[in-house]
């Protein structure tokens, strides 16, 4: 409450921090408080997210009546939407359709979520006073954050390091890369200790649904017994028809994937991002 925020963006919300909030509904309600800040002049909301209506209602109830701008990758009724979206391992391209006109955008950032975040950033910058025509010229020069869909090329294999540590984030990373893999799509991941235990088997199921082979490993156990974390990760999971390795030492798990991945394979190393 000590910040005089003028532009607020709602991108998305998925299961996380339930060890603190208790339920996803309570977590969403906490996020919605941002859009009631009376200092706000503009609110930018992703219509593609399932909680967007809650955020819209909060913004509309704001006595300061901030300007509400919406965006979407799929809905043409949004103020800003896109067409001709194409994904490549080198990034994405699309046509941005806005109140100011249509613009061709070439982004070097990999992944669906990066298209969403880029769109939100362009809208915020435009509202802050920059022309979209100028902004899109700088997009090809963007560099991704370390550990966020960070690509490491090795001969005919690809390794991707990402911070994904929720079921939804892991699904997004894997489905993005599945479009491009010609061999096997590997997932190396773990679950943090002293956090929401309920999402652990959901993480495993997400990996099994979208990758094969899968390596279960450690993330950051904090003060929790690592064995309990692995037990939770396997709770109620059917491992039939999947190649699954359980390697508790994260360094050894990564070494195993590097040693066994073949030409055409993509290996996702998820959970810790830039941390080493």
Language model regions located:
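Acidic, Mg2+-coordinating active-site environments of NTP-dependent enzymes
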Residues: 4-159, 234-236
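ATP-dependent carboxylate-amine ligase
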Residues: 65-67, 100, 110, 120-276
């Amino acid at each position: 409450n000590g910040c005089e925020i003028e532009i607020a963006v709602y991108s998305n919300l998925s299961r996380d921090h339930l060890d603190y909030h208790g339920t996803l509904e309570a977590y969403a309600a906490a996020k919605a408080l941002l859009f009631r800040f009376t200092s706000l002049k503009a609110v930018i909301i992703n219509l593609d997210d399932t909680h967007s209506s809650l955020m819209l209602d909060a913004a509309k109830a704001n006595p300061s009546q901030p300007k509400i701008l919406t965006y979407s990758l799929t809905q043409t009724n949004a103020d800003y939407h896109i067409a001709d979206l194409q994904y490549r391992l080198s990034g994405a391209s699309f046509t941005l359709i806005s109140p100011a006109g249509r613009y061709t955008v070439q982004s070097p950032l990999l992944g669906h979520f990066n298209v969403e975040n880029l769109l939100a950033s362009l809208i915020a910058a435009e509202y802050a006073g920059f022309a979209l025509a100028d902004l899109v010229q700088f997009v090809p020069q963007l560099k991704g954050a370390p550990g966020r869909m960070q690509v490491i090329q090795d001969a005919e294999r690809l390794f991707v390091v990402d911070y994904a540590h929720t079921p939804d984030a892991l699904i997004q990373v894997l489905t993005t890369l599945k479009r491009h893999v010609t061999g096997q799509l590997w997932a190396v991941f773990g679950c943090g200790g002293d956090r929401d235990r309920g999402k652990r088997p959901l993480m495993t199921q997400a990996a099994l649904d979208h990758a094969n082979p899968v390596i279960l490993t450690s993330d950051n156990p904090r003060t929790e017994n690592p064995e309990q974390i692995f037990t939770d990760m396997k709770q109620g999971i059917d491992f039939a028809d999947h190649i699954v390795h359980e390697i508790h030492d994260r360094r050894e798990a990564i070494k195993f994937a590097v040693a066994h991945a073949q030409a055409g394979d993509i290996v996702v190393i998820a959970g810790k991002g830039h941390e080493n």
